Amino acid sequence: MNDKPNKWIFIPILAILFVMIGYQYVCPAGGQACHFRTGDKLVRIAPLATPDPTTDDLYREQDPEEDNPPKCASKFNFTERDLTRDVDFNIKGDDVIVFLHIQKTGGTTFGRHLVRNIRLEQPCDCKAGQKKCTCHRPGKQESWLFSRFSTGWSCGLHADWTELTNCVPVIMDKRQPPKRKRNFYYITMLRDPVSRYLSEWKHVQRGATWKTSLHMCDGRSPTQDELPTCYNGDDWSGVTLHDFMDCPSNLANNRQVRMLADLSLVGCYNLSTMNESERNPILLASAKSNLKNMAFYGLTEFQRKTQYLFERTFHLRFISAFTQINSTRAANVELRDDMRSRIEQLNMLDMQLYEFAKDLFLQRYQFVRQRERQEERLKRREERRWIRERRVNQSKEPIVENQTRVTTTEDYASQVVRW
C-alpha cells in the first residue's frame, strides 16, 4: 500500500499550525496591533464613561449618530444664512428669550430645562410649591426669559406667534422700565404631527380644554361663530378618537402651523374672508418663514441635538444632558393604517411644516458640527506649528558650556544658624 498520499495530508496541517503560531506572536490577545472590521466600522471596546462627563462627551458616547450624521439630499434650498444661528445673547443687557409653547410638543420639559438646568451666573430662583421661577439678570430686577415657568401665561394660555409678537413688548414695558430697544429672541419646540395629535387627543380625553386661551388676533378674540366649540359641557372627557377627528373646528388640526403663522394675513379666525385653497398656502408659507427666522427651535424627537443647537446658538450650557423618552401615551396607541392616513390628512399643513422643519434642523446641526470640527483641526494645526517653531528656535540657541563651580573655602560650621 502506498503511504505517499497520507504524507501529503500533513503538509497543509503543518502550514495551518505555523500560521496560527505566527498570528499569536504578531497579534497577542488584547493587543492593539490588529483590528478587524465589521462592515465599515472598527470593532473595539468603548472606553468607560467618566463619572461626570461633559455634555460634549455625552453627545459622542451616548449617541453615535452625532459624530457622523447621515447626509441626505435636501429638497429645500437653504442658504448659509438660513443655517447660521449664532446669537449674541446678552443676559446682562436688554435681551429676552421668548418661548412659544405649542401644546404636546415637549414644551413643558423644555421649559423646565430653561429655568432649572442652565448654568448661569445668577440661576433662576425656583421655590418649592411655586409654579413660576424668578429669572433675573445678574445684579438686576429684570427678567431675561419670557415663558410659562418664568413670567407665567402673561399673553394668554399657550399664546401663539400672532399673540406673542404683539403682546410681549407691551407686557415687558409694563413690568420693567421701558427700553428704547429690546432684542426678543423667539424659540419653540415642534413634534411629529401624528404623535402630537394623538397626544393632544389623549390629553383632552383626560379633561384638558385650554378654553381660557384668548386667541387674540387684530385686537380681538374670535366669536362663537368663528370658533365654535367641539363639545357641550365643561370638557370633552372620554372623547373617542373618531369623535375627536370629526369636529371640523378642532384646533388640534394643523395646530403647529396655526400657532406659528401670522393669522392676520388670512383674516384671523374669520373663514369667510377667503376660501381654504387660498388660506392654507398663506398659512403654511407664513409658518415656515417665521420658524426659519426664529432664533432657535428644537424637535421633540431629537433631544440631544436640540440641546446641542441651543447651547451653540445662545452660548449657554445646560447642567445635565437632555433625555430622549420614546415611551409616551401617543406611542402606546394602536393605530390602524386608515386611521393614521386620516390624521395625516387632517394635519396636512403640519406634515409639510414638519418636513421642512426637520430638514432645516438637521442641516443646521450638520453645519454647526462641521464648523466646529474645522475649528478644532485649525486649532490643532496651529498648536503643531507652534511646537515646531519652538523646537527650531531651541535648536538655534547657543550651547553654554558648564562653568567650573567655585567652591567655598569657608568652614561649614560658620554657615549654621545658631539658635
Swiss-Prot record:
Residue sites binding 3'-phosphoadenylyl sulfate per the record: 101-109, 191, 199, 323-325, 329-330
Pfam family, one: Sulfotransfer_2
Residue ranges annotated as Lumenal topological domain: 29-419
UniProt-listed SUPFAM superfamilies: P-loop containing nucleoside triphosphate hydrolases
Gene3D superfamilies documented for this protein: P-loop containing nucleotide triphosphate hydrolases (3.40.50.300)
Cellular component aspect of the GO annotation: membrane
Chain segments annotated as transmembrane: 8-28
GO MF, any single term: heparan sulfate 6-sulfotransferase activity
Effect of residue 158 to A: Abolishes catalytic activity
Tissue spec. comment: In early somitogenesis, expressed in presumptive forebrain and midbrain, tail bud and Kupffer's vesicle. During mid-somitogenesis, ubiquitous expression which is strongest in the somites and eye. During late somitogenesis, predominantly expressed in eye, hindbrain and ventral somites. At 24 hours post-fertilization (hpf), restricted to lens and neural retina, brain, otic vesicle and somites. At 36 hpf, brain expression is restricted to telencephalon. At 48 hpf, restricted to telencephalon and pectoral fin.
Sequence ranges on the Cytoplasmic membrane side: 1-7
Residues listed as glycosylation sites in the UniProt record: 77, 270, 275, 326, 393, 402
Membrane-protein topology: Single-pass type II membrane protein
UniProt entry keywords in alphabetical sequence: Glycoprotein, Membrane, Signal-anchor, Transferase, Transmembrane, Transmembrane helix
Compartment(s) of residence: Membrane
UniProt xrefs under InterPro entries: Heparan_SO4-6-sulfoTrfase (IPR010635), P-loop_NTPase (IPR027417), Sulfotransferase (IPR005331)
Binding site for substrate: 131-132, 148, 153, 158, 203, 210
Record-annotated active site: 158 (proton acceptor)
Chain's role: 6-O-sulfation enzyme which catalyzes the transfer of sulfate from 3'-phosphoadenosine 5'-phosphosulfate (PAPS) to position 6 of the N-sulfoglucosamine residue (GlcNS) of heparan sulfate.
Protein name in the entry: Heparan-sulfate 6-O-sulfotransferase 3-B
Organism: Danio rerio (Zebrafish)
Gene: hs6st3b
